Curated annotation (Swiss-Prot):
Keywords: 4Fe-4S, Chloroplast, Iron, Iron-sulfur, Membrane, Metal-binding, NAD, NADP, Plastid, Plastoquinone, Quinone, Repeat, Thylakoid, Translocase
The name this protein goes by in its record: NAD(P)H-quinone oxidoreductase subunit I, chloroplastic
PANTHER family: NAD(P)H-QUINONE OXIDOREDUCTASE SUBUNIT I, CHLOROPLASTIC
Taxonomic source organism: Oenothera elata subsp. hookeri
Keyword Lipid biosynthesis: no
HAMAP family given in the database record: NDH1_NuoI
Length: 165
């Protein structure tokens, strides 16, 4: 008779332990139910990037003095700077400036060390194309400012990134 009682006691203990495990899992599920979703509907919703975001590089042709500091500090010698020395003025004149974003690692050294601040990082991160040759931007393409995510009325922006966590 005693083995039967101990069997019922073991069964009762196992039932209580199983109920406790199920309850713990249920509490975790309930704690996750109150959180906001992590993902966003990308083409229609966009996150506003931080101020220090390293996006596409913006270039101002008029400020550049063709010193080639950006080429020297770039770890992959990426910016191509074509210039001509004007002998009468003894000054460099910039002819062409281009960056291939298919190779760029967006380290930001060129922007940081530019003495005239003619380079800056934008919030544009949509650089994907079907042809990699389209990623080679010249001074005209680099000079275009991207449309701000905040100004685009077709896109709903997620202002506070803390809500997404």
């Amino acid at each position: 008779m005693f083995p039967m009682v101990t069997g019922f006691m073991n069964y009762g203990q196992q039932t209580v332990r199983a109920a406790r495990y199920i309850g713990q899992g249920f509490m975790i599920t309930l704690s996750h139910a109150n959180r906001l979703p992590v993902t966003i509907q990308y083409p229609y919703e966009k996150l506003i990037t931080s101020e220090r975001f390293r996006g596409r590089i913006h270039f101002e042709f008029d400020k550049c003095i063709a010193c080639e500091v950006c080429v020297r500090v770039c770890p992959i010698d990426l910016p191509v700077v074509d210039w001509k020395l004007e002998t009468g003025v003894r000054k460099k004149r910039l002819l062409n400036y281009s960056i291939d974003f298919g190779v760029c690692i967006f380290c930001g050294n060129c922007v940081e060390y530019c003495p005239t601040n003619c380079l800056s990082m934008t919030e544009e991160y949509e650089l994907s194309t079907y042809d990699r040759h389209e990623l080679n931007y010249n001074q005209i393409a680099l000079g275009r400012l991207p449309m701000s995510v905040i100004d685009d009325y077709t896109i709903r922006t997620i202002l506070n990134s803390a809500q997404i966590k």
